[in-house]
């Protein structure tokens, strides 16, 4: 589940590299837990953590370079309520989080994997949404924003029988992340927002 650790990562207390380090996070006593899937350069994660210092924020990312970069920014902002996890998101939710433990999940501009042969790599399949439902507290939300209309429509088709109520809309830029700025530079200024609210618990 955990990616191969590197010495520089192991020495950084912000970064979770193994199960022993994960166990040091007492999820039952952590209070409100928010999880960002694929935090990239970490802009949104750091803003949320700064706005809500009483909450625990866990960022999941597969790219070690991003994790190292963001961990330095966490330190420079003196934020002690962020932990970074180098992992595949699907494995992290399956293996590390118990049922009814997460208050909010967000994923801004996940990879849409547009080629048909790569569709199985997409996050938020019906199976994954059922797992996500199980890990979220009743009434809590998952926010997904994408630049791909095709990916948005695909996700909406995955939603039946996942226990979520859904709101979907087209929104202007508002997150000021690296990917959002990238699209703005290319004159792409509308994005697709899916807000999922847990309305029924799903056993997995």
Swiss-Prot record:
Residues reported to bind substrate: 115, 147, 177-180
Listed EC numbers: 2.1.1.33
Annotated GO MF terms: tRNA (guanine(46)-N7)-methyltransferase activity
A GO-annotated cellular component: tRNA methyltransferase complex
Residues at which S-adenosyl-L-methionine binds: 36, 61, 111
One Pfam family it belongs to: Methyltransf_4
Pathway: tRNA modification; N(7)-methylguanine-tRNA biosynthesis
Catalysed reaction, written as an equation: guanosine(46) in tRNA + S-adenosyl-L-methionine = N(7)-methylguanosine(46) in tRNA + S-adenosyl-L-homocysteine
Gene3D superfamilies membership: Vaccinia Virus protein VP39
Disulfide bridge map: none
Record carries keyword S-adenosyl-L-methionine: yes
Active site as annotated: 111
Keywords: Methyltransferase, S-adenosyl-L-methionine, Transferase, tRNA processing
Keyword Magnesium: no
InterPro entries named among the record's database cross-references: SAM-dependent_MTases_sf, tRNA_(Gua-N-7)_MeTrfase_Trmb, tRNA_methyltr_TrmB_bact
Protein family per UniProt: Belongs to the class I-like SAM-binding methyltransferase superfamily. TrmB family.
Known function: Catalyzes the formation of N(7)-methylguanine at position 46 (m7G46) in tRNA.
Protein name (record): tRNA (guanine-N(7)-)-methyltransferase
Natural source organism: Chlorobium phaeobacteroides (strain DSM 266 / SMG 266 / 2430)
């Amino acid at each position: 589940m955990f990616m191969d650790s590197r010495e520089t990562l192991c020495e950084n207390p912000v970064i979770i590299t193994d199960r022993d380090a994960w166990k040091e996070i007492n999820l039952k006593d952590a209070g409100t837990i928010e999880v960002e899937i694929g935090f990239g350069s970490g802009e949104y994660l750091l803003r949320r953590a700064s706005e809500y210092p009483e909450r625990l924020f866990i960022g999941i990312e597969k790219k070690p370079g991003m994790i190292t970069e963001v961990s330095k920014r966490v330190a420079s902002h003196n934020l002690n309520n962020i932990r970074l996890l180098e992992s595949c998101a699907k494995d992290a939710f399956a293996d590390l989080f118990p049922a009814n433990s997460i208050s909010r999940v967000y994923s801004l501009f996940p990879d849409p994997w547009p080629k048909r042969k790569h569709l199985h790599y997409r996050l938020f399949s019906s199976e994954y949404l059922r797992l996500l439902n199980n890990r979220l507290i009743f009434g809590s939300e998952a926010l997904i924003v994408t630049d791909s209309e095709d990916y948005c429509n695909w996700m909406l088709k995955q939603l039946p029988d996942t226990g979520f109520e859904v709101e979907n809309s087209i929104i202007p830029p508002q997150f000021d992340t690296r990917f959002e700025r990238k699209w703005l530079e290319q004159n792409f200024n509308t994005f697709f927002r899916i807000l999922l609210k847990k309305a029924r618990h799903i056993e997995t």
